[in-house]
Amino acid sequence: MIQLAGDFSRSIGMLFQLILPGCALLALALSLLTAVRVPAAVNWRLAVLVGELGYVLALVPLTVGCTALTGYASAPGATLVTLGACALALIFLLKPSAQAWQLGRELPARLAAAFGPVPVTRPAFALANLGFRTPAPGPMQTHEFAPGLVLDYYPAAKGSGPAACVVVIHGGGWDSGDRRQLPGLNHWLARQGYAVAAVSYRLAPAHPWPAQREDILAALAWLKTHAGQLGLDPARLVLLGRSAGGQIATAVGYLGDPAVRGVVALYAPHDMRFAWSVSRPDDALNSLLLMRQFLGGPPEAREAIYDSASGQQLVKPGTTPPTLLIHGTIDTLVWVRHSRRMAARLAEAGVPHLLLELPWATHALEAHAGGPGGQLTTHALEHFLAAVTAPAK
């Protein structure tokens, strides 16, 4: 019995002197992903998890800290280290929610100033809305719009007349990804009264630019031709792209088609010469290889191709549609400066626009609909789409 008691005492001592401090320091290290750009060696998806679910992960340092308090008498030094690390981890894990609350207070006024006021009743961000929300799936049809290319069509769930249509262009570095990427947003948009077309396009390296532009233009032409049977308004289209899809969205959406009422680009590059200049072979994506595959070589050898793929070079006063840009400040895969430079060019040309920059966020910031990034993104989309697709009076 005495031996067992001694073993138990040593186990408890190890818990308070080694295990709890280790857990606390690990939690602190993970929490820092809400404040610093993820090193290339760290999977960026981990940063998405920590940033958008920090309010849940905060239970870990909270539990560890409370447990450590009970052992202060036996291991005061280790307990203080544990408590300090837990306190810092809590701050960083809850930082996204605090920053989202502050941004949410300002966002409605910023959206109204950029695109005009619209009746949006729900708050941009609410702590009560944090949680796991999976949009209920609605009907979806698959159609071939060109040989070998299909789109998924989500009919608008409400509304009496032809619906405005959001054309969703997937990301994936131009050489991967598909139209089924993050479908929850498509179902949510359909429930808001918009038709949604999630389109496929040919991928590099087998199909370099401008194949992707041709495919999206073909999809737009098909949607317009079949607007009557689909129940959409061919004169009210919005392009929405993520990452590489955002690059395609601006490069196509800025060609001057009056039916394109707006463009939404999430964490995307828009000036391919600039993208080449800041890329390295050892970055998280091996961006130089991706761009060689996509654009056929370096900019000095493919000047016209680089220019036609750069929405920033296509901005024109009076014809470029209103644009919503959303980007995470600490995005490792696509530098936030891409969106900042695009916003500056749009401002210079007098194009209505807004850059929503999320300080804690990285790539795929809207993947968790109930998280800080998801709430702010859907609010911004709700306002933007209502403003730019309003029927002409």
Describe every region a protein language model picked out.
Residues 13-24, 33, 39, 51, ...:
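C-terminal catalytic histidine-bearing segment of alpha/beta-hydrolase fold enzymes
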Residues 318-319, 325-327, 331:
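Short beta-strand/loop motif that positions the catalytic acidic residue
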Residues 38, 45-64, 115-160:
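N-terminal cap/lid segment of alpha/beta-hydrolase-fold proteins
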Residues 68, 218-280:
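Primarily recognizes the serine-hydrolase "nucleophile elbow" in alpha/beta-hydrolase
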Residues 162-172:
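Short beta-strand element of the alpha/beta-hydrolase
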Residues 177-186, 197-236, 255, 368-377:
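Catalytic nucleophile-loop/oxyanion-hole region of alpha/beta-hydrolase
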Residues 272, 330-334:
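Acidic catalytic loop of the alpha/beta-hydrolase fold
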Residues 109-125, 250-304:
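Hydrolase active-site cap/lid region
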